[in-house]
């Protein structure tokens, strides 16, 4: 099995990895259809989106400037806990949802490209996140608690098996 994936050496992404997430997925999409040579092949990408600072629109446009100022999320303290200000927490949640929209668009582009190339039907495709985030005023965004467990541990897992036609949703986790 040979493997390939974006190298992360993109000069347009000099900052932390979260600035590069959409670019890395786009690079993977562009590689669909390239001849990997004989035998099985693994394409992979580690994309850090959606992730703080939640800076992308569903169209993939960055709406905040690069730099440390963009890392600040109103309502989220340095201790990674939310303020009691529900408006600030709701705004952060909306920013998160915008970036989820960007991820959804990229996944759709990947599927479309694989279908157009004829690789979708025979492919095993796995998409997974490593953690969620809680948007509960006054509580930590990432530290599990009885109040935040459902948000933090509710992570997406998408598996498309080779030859699979019908999908299903399984919420038993």
Per-segment meaning from a language model:
Residues 1-173:
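Catalytic domains that recognize anionic headgroups
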């Amino acid at each position: 099995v040979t493997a390939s994936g974006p190298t992360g050496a993109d000069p347009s992404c000099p900052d932390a990895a979260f600035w590069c997430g959409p670019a890395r997925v786009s690079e993977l999409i562009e590689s669909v259809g390239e001849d990997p040579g004989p035998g099985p092949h693994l394409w992979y990408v580690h994309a850090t989106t959606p992730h703080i600072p939640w800076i992308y629109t569903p169209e993939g446009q960055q709406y905040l400037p690069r730099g440390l100022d963009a890392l600040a999320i109103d309502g989220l303290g340095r201790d990674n806990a939310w303020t009691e200000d529900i408006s600030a927490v709701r705004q952060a949640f909306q920013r998160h949802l915008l970036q989820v929209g960007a991820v959804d668009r990229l996944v759709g582009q990947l599927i479309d490209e694989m279908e157009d190339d004829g690789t979708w039907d025979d492919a095993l495709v796995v998409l997974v996140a490593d953690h969620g985030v809680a948007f509960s005023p006054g509580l930590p965004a990432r530290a599990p608690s009885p109040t935040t467990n459902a948000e933090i541990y509710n992570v997406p897992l998408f598996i498309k098996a080779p030859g699979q036609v019908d999908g299903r949703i399984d919420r038993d986790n």
